[in-house]
C-alpha cells in the first residue's frame, strides 16, 4: 500500500514540472501580420504548447519534426495542444498563410534535428511572398 501511494505521488509530481506554453495565432502581432506569437518557444520534454485561435481562419500544421514524432494538423479556428515528447526542433506553419511566412519554431531540449529543420526553414523562407526573414529570425534563436 505504501509503495503504491509513493508511486502515485511520484507520478503526480512529475507532471507538476511540465509547463504549458501558449502561442497565439494572430492576424496582427508584434512581428507583423499573419503571425504566431511568440514565434519561437524554448521548451522542455513533457511540456505542452497550446496554439490559441485568437483570430479566425488560422490553424497549425507541422513541417519539420524530430524523428519519431507524428505529423500534426489542427482544425480551422480551434485551439490545439501539442505534447512535446521528444527533444529537437519543431517547425510549423499556418497552411492558408504560409506564403505570408506565418510559421514558427519550437526548440525542445537539444536541437538534435537542427540541420533538417534548417532546410525546411530555408525552403519556407524561399517561398514566402511577404515577411521574409521572420522565420529565419526565429530559427536563429535555436542553440
Q: Where is each model-derived feature located?
A:
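Positively charged n-region of N-terminal signal peptides that target proteins for export
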Residues: 1-4
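Sec-dependent N-terminal signal peptides
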Residues: 7-8
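N-terminal signal peptide c-region/cleavage motif recognized by signal peptidases
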Residues: 13-15
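Extracytoplasmic copper-binding redox domains, predominantly the cupredoxin/blue-copper superfamily
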Residues: 17-143
Amino acid at each position: 500500500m505504501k509503495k503504491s501511494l509513493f508511486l502515485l505521488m511520484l507520478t503526480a509530481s512529475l507532471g507538476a514540472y511540465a509547463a504549458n506554453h501558449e502561442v497565439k495565432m494572430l492576424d496582427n502581432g508584434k512581428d507583423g501580420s499573419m503571425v504566431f506569437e511568440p514565434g519561437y518557444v524554448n521548451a522542455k520534454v513533457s511540456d505542452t504548447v497550446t496554439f490559441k485561435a485568437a483570430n479566425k481562419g488560422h490553424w497549425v500544421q507541422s513541417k519539420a519534426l524530430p524523428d519519431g514524432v507524428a505529423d500534426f494538423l489542427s482544425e480551422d479556428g480551434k485551439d490545439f495542444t501539442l505534447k512535446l515528447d521528444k527533444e529537437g526542433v519543431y517547425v510549423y506553419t499556418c497552411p492558408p498563410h504560409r506564403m505570408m511566412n506565418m510559421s514558427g519554431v519550437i526548440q525542445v531540449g537539444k536541437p538534435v534535428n537542427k540541420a533538417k529543420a534548417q532546410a525546411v526553414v530555408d525552403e519556407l523562407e524561399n517561398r514566402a511572398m511577404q515577411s521574409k526573414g521572420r522565420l529565419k529570425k526565429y530559427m536563429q534563436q535555436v542553440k
